[in-house]
A protein has these predicted regions:
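Intrinsically disordered, low-complexity N-terminal segments that are enriched in acidic
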Residues: 1-83
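Active-site nucleophilic cysteine motif
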Residues: 132-139, 169-184
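Sterically constrained small-residue positions within well-ordered secondary structures
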Residues: 11, 50, 64, 164, ...
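Acidic low-complexity segments
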Residues: 49-53, 65-167
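Short beta-turn/strand-loop junction motif enriched in small, turn-promoting residues
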Residues: 6-10, 127, 198
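Active-site rim elements
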Residues: 167-169, 197
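Terminal peptide-recognition signature
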Residues: 20, 139, 210
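Hydrophobic/aromatic-rich core segments of domains that either
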Residues: 175-223
């Protein structure tokens, strides 16, 4: 994989420092391994720690009048799909006093909020179900069947993204993931946001998805 970022000539005044952060693979995820840096355009660079949430390779250089500034690096890694053949019997009761449980079942402004609209939708979709796996399946199936994909507005212009999805009957990957995360958290299932690049050969794109936590299993990706 090669990332290249080019700053056009004279966009930055001559002599000023241009700072560049390019995405670098995390190595604390079991779905990707064997990360190897192959080449870097600059001799001086910094790679963020392996567990950084937004891991990057950082470079900087002075702007030169009438010259482009090019930042580039290449790496390779091994990726794999991850699939869980889950059953209710595999999932242990949550430790509701744990730090993990409290953090990932809590509201988080401005989008993960247990509003009246979210609570009402939860009553309709989840009903009286108490088994974590079955609650997740109900939430996932409902969202998948009722909200079509649509290109998103700039997220910062939407006051509450899950409610936007409910009201407009559509959303992009991140929007429906936020609705899924919010409904899971409301029902006591730890859930969190994930984001990264889809590295399809010749068709790189950004993507968002969710992960949910089952006691005895760990974090499970949901897309």
């Amino acid at each position: 994989v090669t990332y290249t970022l080019t700053v056009k000539a004279n966009v930055v005044p001559d002599g000023e420092i241009i700072r560049c952060w390019l995405p670098y693979p995390r190595e604390d995820n079991r779905r990707q391994k064997n990360v190897a840096l192959l080449a870097v355009s600059d001799s001086e660079y910094t790679i963020a720690p392996k567990n950084a949430l937004h891991r990057t390779l950082y470079m900087e250089k002075k702007a030169v009048k009438d010259q482009q500034a090019v930042f580039s690096f290449s790496f390779r890694y091994t990726s794999a799909a991850e699939w869980f053949n889950l059953t209710d019997e595999m999932i242990q009761p949550y430790d509701t006093s744990s730090t993990l449980y409290k953090e990932f079942t809590a509201e988080r402004s401005t989008h993960i909020l247990f509003t009246p609209a979210i609570r009402e939708l939860s009553r309709q979709v989840v009903g009286n179900e108490k088994r974590p796996l079955q609650m997740v399946r109900k939430i996932f199936t409902y969202i998948n069947n009722n909200y079509s994909w649509a290109s998103a507005r700039e997220y910062s212009t939407v006051p509450n993204i899950p409610e936007y999805v409910i009201e407009n009957k559509h959303g992009d990957c991140g929007m429906v993931s936020l609705l899924f995360i919010t409904l899971c958290r409301l029902n006591g299932i730890p859930a969190k946001w994930q984001s990264g690049f889809m590295m399809h050969p010749g068709d790189v794109n950004l993507h968002d998805w969710a992960e949910i936590y089952f006691k005895g299993i760990g974090w499970v990706p949901v897309d």
